[in-house]
């Protein structure tokens, strides 16, 4: 006598499968913090080099940081944001500037 598989016992049974709802990963804002020592042109260079901003947009962000105390450079996944923060802070120290970059959940 042939063995029956579990599928053969389930005649007429319909199983609905659904994909689990997966929330998108959280996004993080990368911020520059104003200080009284870092030259404005250095901040613009950082924005262009690390955040791929055009000169006009980099200048706008730099002025926002200068007048408001901090400004958003971009919004990224956690890993990318952490990497950008580390790169900017290291670049600032290597160039002997106190410019600080940080991140917070968007």
Swiss-Prot record:
Disulfide bonds: none annotated. Residues 1-21 are annotated as: Disordered. It comes from the Bacteria. Gene3D superfamilies: 3.30.1390.10. GO terms for biological process: protein catabolic process; proteolysis. Transmembrane segments: none annotated. Residues 1-13 have a biased composition (Basic and acidic residues). Belongs to the ClpS family. Binds to the N-terminal domain of the chaperone ClpA. HAMAP family: ClpS (MF_00302). Involved in the modulation of the specificity of the ClpAP-mediated ATP-dependent protein degradation. NCBIfam families: PRK00033.1-2, PRK00033.1-3, PRK00033.1-5. PANTHER family: ATP-DEPENDENT CLP PROTEASE ADAPTER PROTEIN CLPS, ATP-DEPENDENT CLP PROTEASE ADAPTER PROTEIN CLPS1, CHLOROPLASTIC. This is ATP-dependent Clp protease adapter protein ClpS. It comes from Xanthomonas campestris pv. campestris (strain ATCC 33913 / DSM 3586 / NCPPB 528 / LMG 568 / P 25). The gene is clpS.
